[in-house]
Amino acid sequence: MTLGLVGRKVGMTRVFDEQGVSVPVTVLDMSANRVTQVKSKDTDGYTAVQVTFGQKKANRVNKAEAGHFAKAGVEAGRGLIEFALTEEKLAELKAGDEITVSMFEVGQLVDVTGISKGKGFSGTIKRHNFGAQRTSHGNSRSHRVPGSIGMAQDPGRVFPGKRMAGQYGNTKATVQKLEVVRVDAERQLLLVKGAVPGAVNSDVVVRPSVKVGA
């Protein structure tokens, strides 16, 4: 139950620390996060804050969205997301507030969630890291097949969850405990160590890590 930010993956680069060591980082644009609604147990049955991010053209906003954003007094965004919060933290926020990247600090660990890159229909070698069979010496047309996928007449079926070929990627993925390397409050940029899920320009959600000290 922590507050986070929604940002845009700009790309990867590297920075140098005080010892001159090259550190690979992902640049995240965390600008324009606005509170659109504060939900309480009295009115909604649970406590959470609703946030919008980015911008949307006026001709792309329907009447329901326009009314919702106008009530909050914020510019229309690309989407809405909720963060579950305690009543104490919820009391510090109100509709129309802007949440900035300053909520993070250098050295802090964060969890980043995004939609992984889609790889299309992939076989078991690529999708599940299966080993390939021999390329020659008696092997014919079975170089990349997964092998047996079931049993005999009993049970006479393939068990659910069997690792097989299929859609690979394009799913929600989270990378945990990434270190914040730099916080650029002026340009609302966040630099985190390592790679994060998703393609360039895709949306990501950044939250304080839930496994700090673990």
From Swiss-Prot:
Methylated by PrmB. Pfam families: Ribosomal_L3 (PF00297). Residues 131-155 are annotated as: Disordered. Keywords: Methylation, Ribonucleoprotein, Ribosomal protein, RNA-binding, rRNA-binding. Disulfide bonds: none annotated. The modification N5-methylglutamine is found at Q153. InterPro entries: Ribosomal_uL3, Ribosomal_uL3_bac/org-type, Ribosomal_uL3_CS, Transl_B-barrel_sf. GO terms for biological process: translation. GO terms for cellular component: cytosolic large ribosomal subunit. PANTHER family: 50S RIBOSOMAL PROTEIN L3 (PTHR11229), LARGE RIBOSOMAL SUBUNIT PROTEIN UL3C (PTHR11229:SF16). Belongs to the universal ribosomal protein uL3 family. One of the primary rRNA binding proteins, it binds directly near the 3'-end of the 23S rRNA, where it nucleates assembly of the 50S subunit. Part of the 50S ribosomal subunit. Forms a cluster with proteins L14 and L19. This is Large ribosomal subunit protein uL3. It comes from Neisseria meningitidis serogroup C (strain 053442).
